Swiss-Prot record:
It catalyses: adenosine(37) in tRNA1(Val) + S-adenosyl-L-methionine = N(6)-methyladenosine(37) in tRNA1(Val) + S-adenosyl-L-homocysteine + H(+). One of its GO terms (cellular component) is cytoplasm. It comes from Bacteroides thetaiotaomicron (strain ATCC 29148 / DSM 2079 / JCM 5827 / CCUG 10774 / NCTC 10582 / VPI-5482 / E50). This is tRNA1(Val) (adenine(37)-N6)-methyltransferase. GO terms for molecular function: nucleic acid binding; tRNA (adenine-N6)-methyltransferase activity. Its EC number is 2.1.1.223.
Length: 237
């Protein structure tokens, strides 16, 4: 039986009620997205609350985080995870569809680990299907909403499959959002990137591209991945 929770250095994420469990994509997003100087942060599709909790750990002490989640069970578990954390007063979990979310104040930082496998076959489990597929929240709709909610000097960071990168960049440019940082994620030596993290801003000043190898052998993290996640993973000193 899979462990119902994942223990990090400063917080614990229970994921037994969530369709999508704690995984590398979320950890990468939470560790890599810049939160420098941010006072207002939005996490779209928070799931267990993992990314929101990771960002709370390394953001300013007065930074406030809104964690949006459409699925009722996941939102409930995210609220429980936040309530057990040191940052329960700074993270607000909101059960709502992002397509209908409105905020009177814009955000310095927006992040999202959105549904994926856009064109794959439907999953038999409805909850897992909602978490994995973006039939209702397309990349285009996501980016339009982000553009409306992001401050002029703000950043939006997303983790996506590499095969949709061109589509996402094209959609982003329609709303004057441009890639400024890009991390190609390789899971094994000699492999090709299957995941990509991209930071978008309203400034079209070129993009810094980097690569990250996560494992040098099966269940053996690379030094660069260890360095990125050292403040989170319990077993990394």
């Amino acid at each position: 039986m899979a462990n119902p929770f994942f223990q990090f250095k400063q917080f614990t994420v229970w994921h037994d009620k969530c369709a999508m469990k704690v995984g590398t994509d979320g950890v990468l997003l939470g560790a890599w997205a810049s939160v420098q100087g941010a006072h207002r942060i939005l996490d779209i599709g928070t799931g267990t609350g993992l990314v929101a909790l990771m960002l709370a750990q390394r953001s300013l002490p007065d930074a406030n985080i809104v964690a949006l989640e459409i699925d009722e069970a996941a939102a409930g578990q995210a609220k429980e995870n936040v309530a057990r954390s040191p940052w329960k007063d700074r993270i607000e979990v909101v059960k709502q569809d992002f397509l209908f979310y409105q905020s009177p104040d814009k955000f310095d930082v927006i992040v999202s680990n959105p549904p994926y496998f856009v064109d794959s076959l439907s999953c038999p489990d409805q909850q897992r299907s909602m978490a994995r597929h973006n039939d209702s929240l397309t990349y285009e709709k996501l980016l339009k909403g982000v553009a409306d909610l992001l401050k002029k000097e703000g950043t939006f960071t997303i983790v996506i499959p590499t095969d949709v990168a061109d589509r996402v960049k094209t959609a982003a440019s329609e709303y004057h959002l441009y890639a400024t940082r890009q991390l190609n994620v390789i899971t094994k030596p000699g492999g090709t990137p299957k995941r990509m993290l991209i930071t978008f801003t309203f400034n079209n000043e070129g993009c810094i591209k980097e690569e990250l190898l996560t494992e040098v052998a099966r269940h053996q993290y690379s030094e660069e991945y260890k360095e990125l996640t050292r403040e989170y993973y319990l077993h990394l000193k």
